[in-house]
A protein has these predicted regions:
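N-terminal Rossmann-like FAD-binding beta1-loop-alpha1 element of flavoenzymes
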Residues: 2-29, 420, 424-425
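Residue-level detector of alpha-helix initiation sites
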Residues: 6, 10-11, 174-176, 399
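Glycine-rich FAD pyrophosphate-binding loop
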Residues: 21-45
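Residue-level recognition of phosphate/Mg2+-coordinating polar/acidic sites
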Residues: 22-23, 35, 56-58, 75, ...
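A conserved beta-strand/loop capping segment in the N-terminal third of enzymes
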Residues: 41-110, 243
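Short beta-strand to alpha-helix junction loop
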Residues: 70-78, 97-117, 177-182, 208-212, ...
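Predominantly flavin-linked oxidoreductase catalytic cores and closely associated redox partners
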Residues: 110, 118-320
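A conserved FAD-binding loop/helix module that cradles the flavin
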Residues: 176-189, 193, 400-432
Length: 433
């Protein structure tokens, strides 16, 4: 029986293990964490977004510069296949109003339990064997006289040990949420073998705004004023729109919501544009987008309401009465505008429809939902095997791709794990012949 060493017990690794075990391969899964699927469970805390229901032709566009490579992976395991697979685990799914697909109970734990039950007690093929608290050291072990194939060296609770298999599949994740296992430590290990790796960068991340206190006490290089940060951090901007054009001409415009943080912004609308913001900051030093606080109203209508006589009412009361702007939406206007500007009806109306916010930096990668960069597809053959390390395959977020939230991340991880496992099977069949 052929044996495969699989490093990484996240979604990509578990899917690869399922495919290999069902094909009759002895699979040993190694992971540095005490239990399986740590990041997967965290992703399901607010509702496990399995995939998206949109048509495949639109679905693949979410992968940006790598959509051609990801499209090849999704051909056999796209959104529809993910739902069908979940069904085989006894997990029914539904499509939310946004087109996102969730389990009926919204939870990740029941799906993971059913999945592990299948892997540990399969109806066909050998049981997958799990070795937790085993951290790959980045070193390859030398086989002894009675061993063949590829060896890896692990740090384990019992000390350093070597394991050998006929092939290796790496599903080590990116570099976000290091405490859950994805720490990016593997990057220099593969680089020393000549593997081309794009730098790991934060994706689906928050950003620090450029300083809004320009001079005087409290002035900082970046971040909100002390008052705004203390009063409004954690509050959402609801029913707004943002628009952004990069210096190279790429455009983004979308309605939705996001959240103010102590130093900037985060949330679904920001995440959707995060790759553009990040790359603009890296090339230009900053990124300025425009916030529309009332996307369903025209500038002319807003201006008319701002100019409407307000009598003895305060400006805040006037805006709340005429335009239903209050709370954080009023606060951001005061944060970004001078007293003279905010008392000028035309400047105020223009700011309500297009308030410029400048982002100074992406938040650290360890805070990001996911990461961009990784093993470049040019370093892999069509079966996801490293050309510089024959018999070693890669899958999941450690590959050089990124996608927004919405089910695209998990779908591509599952699809790449499945594809890499099929590549392993092809490799093993060739080695037999």
């Amino acid at each position: 029986m052929k044996k495969v060493l699989l490093v990484g017990a996240g979604p990509a690794g578990l899917m690869a293990a399922e495919v290999l075990s069902a094909a009759g391969v002895e699979v040993h899964v190694y992971d540095a964490m005490p239990s399986v699927g740590r990041k997967f469970l965290l992703a399901g805390k607010g509702g496990l977004n399995l995939t998206h229901s949109e048509p495949p032709a639109i679905f693949v566009t979410r992968y940006g510069k790598r959509q051609a490579q990801i499209a090849a992976l999704l051909q056999d395991f796209g959104g529809k296949a993910v739902r069908e697979w979940a069904g085989t685990l006894g997990v029914e799914t539904f499509v939310g109003t946004s087109g996102r697909v969730f389990p009926l109970d919204m939870k990740a734990a029941p799906l993971l339990r059913a999945w592990l039950q299948r892997l540990r007690h399969p109806t066909r093929g050998p049981a997958v064997q799990f070795h937790m608290r085993h951290r790959w050291t980045g070193r390859a072990g030398e086989p002894s006289a009675d061993e063949v194939g590829i060896g890896l060296v692990f740090d384990s609770p019992k000390g350093e040990l070597s394991a050998h298999g006929d092939a290796v599949l790496l599903a080590l994740g990116g570099a976000s949420w290091a405490r859950l296992g994805s720490d990016g430590a593997w990057v220099p290990w593969l680089q020393t073998r000549g593997v081309e790796i794009a730098p790991l960068l934060p994706a689906n991340c928050g950003f620090d705004v450029a300083n809004t206190v320009r001079t005087g006490p409290g002035a900082t290089a970046r971040g909100w004023s002390p008052y705004f940060a203390s009063q409004f951090a954690g509050q959402p901007f609801k029913s707004v729109a943002i628009s952004f054009t990069t210096t190279s001409g790429a455009r983004f415009a979308r309605k939705g919501e996001f959240v103010a943080t102590a130093s900037g912004v985060e949330g679904s609308l920001v995440y959707a544009a995060s790759s553009l913001f990040r790359d603009e900051i890296m090339s230009q030093g900053a990124a300025t987008f425009y916030l529309d606080l009332l996307p369903d109203l025209s500038l002319e209508h807003v201006l008319a309401q701002v100019r409407h006589p307000r009598g003895s009412r305060s400006l805040s009361s006037h805006l709340k009465s005429r335009l239903h702007i209050d709370g954080i939406k009023v606060a951001i206007l005061h944060e970004m505008m001078s007293k003279e500007q905010i008392n000028d009806p035309l400047q105020l109306a223009s700011a309500i429809k297009a308030l410029a916010l400048t982002l100074a930096a992406a938040r650290p990668i360890d805070e990001a939902i996911s990461s961009a960069g990784g093993v470049q597809f040019e370093a892999l053959d069509p079966n996801l095997m490293l050309t510089r390390w024959p018999g070693v395959f890669c899958a999941g977020e450690m590959l050089d791709w990124e996608a927004p939230t919405g089910g695209y991340l998990l779908t591509a991880c599952l699809a790449s794990g499945r594809s890499a496992a099929q590549g392993v099977l092809s490799y093993l069949s060739r080695s037999i012949s």
